[in-house]
């Protein structure tokens, strides 16, 4: 599987059990190689992680929106045994969602690390502006619903 082999390359030079290093390496790799591109108006497109990785190998980069990036980030984290979640967020009225990002758990500290290349270096600022959110586990079937909602 292409996603697995690329993930192994990304984390391959790290010390064993450098879990935070793995998370940060995956975040940096995706940030450097996936460029944000909005979906067309009134259309929701989703590129699977395999396709994004193929584009990266073919062109050196891929294009995708926040959900494409979050799915790739979570898939790569799952490939190295990390727990991952999707945070579906809104910045306006309750229940009005406009963004999604991944967060990955560092098993050593149990802390969740926000991985959002779309926010770039402004992650803290973005998190402060969130007015509504749902957290979905990537480890469970979607039929269970969100694990947390505000």
Question: What annotation goes with each model-predicted range?
Answer:
Residues 1-150:
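A structural boundary/capping signal
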